[in-house]
C-alpha cells in the first residue's frame, strides 16, 4: 500500500520491492545485499520458495577503525584453547593500552572496551574466567547486568592479546524461534496474521539475517593508518592488567550514547 511504502522509506530508509519470486528476484535480492554490505555479505538467500509470499531481509555491515590501532610488529602466533583443544592462530598484542576495564570474580568475567575512531562506537570483549562456561555466561546476561558492566568499567592500563578473527553468521530458524519466544507469534500464523497495513492477505514466511565481521590490527573490517598519541608518566611503575583472550570470549559493538 502507498502509505506503507512512504512510511518505511521516510522513517527507516528502507527499500521495498514487489517482485515475482523467480531467479531474477533472487539475483536482485543478493545484489542488494552485496551493495549494502560492501561485498561482505554477497549472498543472503540461496533459494526462494515458489510458495513464498513475503521475505524480510536484514544484512548488517559495520566498518570501524580503532582509535588506537594495534601495531602489526607486535602481532604473534599462539594457541587458542577451546574445551581442551588448541588452535594455532594470530594474536594482536598491545602493551599498556589505556582502555575501560571491568572484572568480577563473583560473576567470573573480565571485559575490555576498545573504542573506534571518535569513540561514538566501541567493541566490548567479554572473557569468562578459566573454568567458567561461556554459554552459562551468555545465558545469564541480562540488560541490567550489561548496564552494570558498562557503568562499572574504569580506565586502566591493560596488556591486551586478542586473536584476529573473521566471522560469518546466518540466522534463520533461530531468529524465527527467538521472535516467537518473545511473543511474536501471530506474524507466522496464517489464521491470525494481520499485515493489512502493508497489503491484504499477507503472511511472513521467512526471516533471515546474515552478518559478517572481521577484526584485525587496524579495526573491524577496515584498512587504514591512524596516528597514535603518546603521553608522559610520573616515573612510577604503573599497575598493568593482563587481558589474554586465548579462550572462548564473546563481543558486542556498542553505541556510546545508548550503551
What are these regions (language model features)?
Residues 113-115, 237-258:
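Feature captures eukaryotic membrane-trafficking machinery centered on endolysosomal pathways
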Residues 142:
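Catalytic and substrate-binding regions of extracellular carbohydrate-active enzymes
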Residues 1-131, 147, 151-236, 240:
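Non-catalytic, conformational "gating/processing" segments within enzyme and secreted inhibitor domains
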